[in-house]
Each structure stands twice: as structure tokens, then as C-alpha cells.
Amino acid sequence: MKIIFNADDFGISPGAVYGILESYKRGVVKSTTLLANSPAFDLAVEVAKENPGLDIGAHLTLTFGSPVLQGLETLTDDDGRFRRNYTSLENGLADVDMNEVERELTAQIEKILDAGITISHFDTHHSIEPLIYPVQHKLAEKYGVSIRRHSDVSDFGAIKTPDLFATEFYADGVSFETIKKLVQKHIGTNDVVEVMTHPAFIDETLREISSYVEPRIKEVSILTSRELQAYLGQQEVEIISFRDL
């Protein structure tokens, strides 16, 4: 089997940037996805350019912070910020203009490209793929990139995806045992499994803007551990990135 350890939230805070960098340089993370509207976007771009082996994707969002574009009336609240989560976006989806969705997501992609970053794949913040899949699919074809697999879609056409998207390594599931169970389930197959991760060093920026904080430092510890890397080697698990699909 092959595993892609993808680190979400690149740029959400300086601590997240450095936590992901640590998980890449000393651990098993080879891919990460960058938030175009994140507080530490410039730092993330700088780190990405200094580490060309780290595979960069776009972490498309309609639920975090403020949009790249202005005047998106159906996507934002009275303060001009995105609605806060998947549920609030889903509940208001009937009133969302999908043209606004496409324009904003395109702007996020173009901001990353304009910064000199090559994008290999797309995923989304708060896993909103089921709500915007037609737009995401269209943009993936346009930019020639891979996307994160999700269970609501059975036919991805010519777009490359892993065979499975694993979300278990999150919150109370952040443990070495979680990854071992995943490996044992797929060992001996040709499956490509993406494991969602959120490693970060905790800082005040992260505490202020994210509800998922404390487990992130534990993720760094596990993803960089010699024990995990030795186990994956013993099981002949190949660690790859989205570039390798």
C-alpha cells in the first residue's frame, strides 16, 4: 500500500507553518494544502519555496476568515466574512450563487499561483467537497490537478485521486495505534490512502482562530516519531505525495 500524509491548514498560523515543516523535514508528511486567505500566507509561501520537495496543494475554503474577493453577497455574513462552518454553509446553500463560489475559489487558486507556487492538488477546509463538488471538479480539470477523494462521488472521470480518504487521525483518534489499524486494513493491497493530518506548533494565532488546537502538537510528535517511521518501513508501506499519483 501507499500512504499520503497530507497536512491541512498550511498558513493558518506561524505555528502551523513550522509544525508542518517539522513534520515534513523529520517525519512522514510529504504533502500540504495552503489556505490562500490565511494569516501566515506569506510565511507559508516562503517556507514552500525553501523546501521544494514539500508538495503544495490549495486548501479551498468558504468557511474560514474573509474571501479573497469582495462583494460576494451570498457567501458572507454582514461583516463580509465567510459563514463559520459546514453546517451554516449547508443550511444556506439554497441561497448561494455558484458563480460566486467559482469566482472565489478561482481567486484563491490564482493567488497561490501568483505567489510562485505550483499546485498539485485541491482539498477543502471543513470538508465542504460534497457541497461544491461540481465547481471543484471543473476547476481541477481546468488546472490539471488531483483532488481529495470523498464518498459522495463514485466517478471522478480523468481526475486523479487516492483510493481512500482516511479521517480517523483527528482529535481523540490522534495516535500511533490509529495509523497501525489503517495499515493493517490495507496492507498487501495496491491501495493509495490519504491520511488527513493537522500538525502544528501551538501559538496565539491558532488559539484565536481555530477550535482544533491541542491535538495538533501531538500530531507533530507522532508524525515525526522514529517508531512510526520504523513501523511503516517494516510493513513496506510507501510514503508518497499527491505529485506521485
From Swiss-Prot:
UniProt xrefs under SUPFAM superfamilies: Glycoside hydrolase/deacetylase
Top EC group: hydrolase
PANTHER family tied to this protein: CARBOHYDRATE DEACETYLASE, YDJC DEACETYLASE FAMILY MEMBER
Keywords: Carbohydrate metabolism, Hydrolase, Magnesium, Metal-binding
Protein name: Carbohydrate deacetylase
HAMAP family listed in its UniProt record: COD
Family: Belongs to the YdjC deacetylase family.
Quaternary context: Homodimer.
A Pfam match: YdjC
One example of a Gene Ontology biological process annotation: polysaccharide catabolic process
Region forming the signal peptide: none
Residues annotated for Mg(2+) binding in this entry: 59, 125
Taxonomic superkingdom: Bacteria
One term of GO molecular function: deacetylase activity
Tagged with keyword Metal-binding: yes
Cofactor dependency: Mg(2+)
Known EC number: 3.5.1.-
Function text: Probably catalyzes the deacetylation of acetylated carbohydrates an important step in the degradation of oligosaccharides.
